[in-house]
């Protein structure tokens, strides 16, 4: 190990166990000794055990409960531009390995801690990279890292016309960062005039509004789950709740569904879903601007004949303390869907909340089925697409549950 110049934090046995097990976060409560002179916010520091054993190097976040986010466990690493270029190349080559070539034009290029870029998300939508930066260390690294992102993809023959930042996320306040959004100025380049682009996924085209859409503009993690729905949808009458911009509904319609109803509480989302249907020439679709919690019991009372229902709601909980209320919400919509479906119908149901674990989700589905006097026959259980990799030792990276079942 070469001589180190970074400040040193000594952590307790609890933190040591987590770090050795693969987790990259050091909480302030687990720190036994801090450097005599506190490092500057967003700079690097080493982390060691009570015996002085090196555990890793990471970015310091002085305003967060997560005091250090590791970026390396190699004491000989030098964190220069070449280091970050290698890491971007590694992340991109991973996507090229696990995704089909056609899916590389709309994929998650960087998935935060799972790619060893703590607090950074980078999504590719055709010719645009859309970023979200949720840690002060990554915020300070942008002038070095973002040009490298564009350079690495371009060197691989990919067209990248600009980088757009979606930093309008409340979590930034926990890092002492302001909320904002706008184009990142790549040196010597001009960015596109439009903040919309088009992507193709599973043969379906989508308009993506990366300035105003949810998160970075489009949910890429369900790409292969949408394909599973499309395979099963042929000939069915489908209801897609929480449709957002129509992704599951469009896949069902393109897959040969007899009729698809796409519902969402957001008028803006429904307008974009209608635009996407027109773009794909799909005429077997209807659209409802409705609250799913009110819509499902109404449809049950009116006797609407749907035999395939899709439930892909936004996260009902983003904290452990609200899990119980969230599970009640998940149970309500799943119970209502099971009541509405005929025996032999199909239910695709998902949760994108890390705190709503698979164990809790299955328990909820069993309770909903019992109350609805139905049984569930499991067809497929899936997770997020592999461009959102799950890093063992970091449970926060394992968040998406997707169940495709027959209701009998």
Task: Label each PLM-derived region with a short phrase.
Residues 110-123, 142-218:
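Non-catalytic substrate-recognition/targeting regions of SAM-dependent transferases
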Residues 235-244:
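Conserved class I S-adenosyl-L-methionine
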Residues 332, 346-408:
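C-terminal catalytic and target-recognition region of SAM-dependent MTase-like enzymes
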Residues 259-264:
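Conserved SAM-binding motif I beta-strand of class I
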